[in-house]
Each structure stands twice: as C-alpha cells, then as structure tokens.
C-alpha cells in the first residue's frame, strides 16, 4: 500500500488528502464524518484516501505517522499541510481551499 500511495501522491493531478486512522481510535471516529464531508464537497477537485494504520503499518511508517488521526495534504507530489489529532471540519476545509485555490 505504501508504494501505491506514493505513486498516487506523485502522479495525481489533483491534491491528495490522506486520513491515517484506526478502528480503536476515538478521535479518528470524531474526524471521520468531516473527512467524508470533505470528500463530498470537493469531489472531482480532491482525492481523499483513508489509511487504516493497523492494516497498513508500512504506509504509516513511511509517512512517519506517530499519532492518529493524522491528516496530510499533498499537492503536486509535495506535502503542503499535516496535522495530528481531531480538528474541526472548517479547519480541514480551509487548508484544502488554500491548496486548491
């Protein structure tokens, strides 16, 4: 998965938003509806990927995820924004808007 994720980030013409999460993570469950809303609002302008760190530990290690939820935004293959912990939808949306203009 890590290599596939790398390929997606590197080759995507659209910004890529990644949510690293786990089933047992309470804050991840709090953020999940916001991530879903983001995917819906920016459909066609943003790729949203959810990565379960328990099922894909190599991807979590590759992207140096130390706390979850970990949210990352890549544009043109470059990391533009990253945060760990639950944040409000409006903050996520603001970061995406900055990236996509």
Swiss-Prot record:
Boundaries of every Thioredoxin domain copy: 2-101
Determine if Electron transport is one of this entry's keywords. Answer: yes
Q: Disulfide pairs?
A: 25-28
Q: Name one GO molecular function term.
A: protein-disulfide reductase activity
Task: Name the domain of life.
Answer: Bacteria
Q: Does the keyword Electron transport apply?
A: yes
Query: Per the record, GO CC terms?
Result: cytoplasm
Q: Which UniProt keywords apply?
A: Disulfide bond, Electron transport, Redox-active center, Transport
Q: Name one Pfam family in it.
A: Thioredoxin
What the protein does?
Participates in various redox reactions through the reversible oxidation of its active center dithiol to a disulfide and catalyzes dithiol-disulfide exchange reactions.
What NCBIfam families has UniProt attached to this entry? thioredoxin
Family in the record: Belongs to the thioredoxin family.
The identity of this protein, by name, is Thioredoxin 1
The record lists the organism as Chlorobaculum tepidum (strain ATCC 49652 / DSM 12025 / NBRC 103806 / TLS) (Chlorobium tepidum)
Give me the gene this protein comes from: trx1
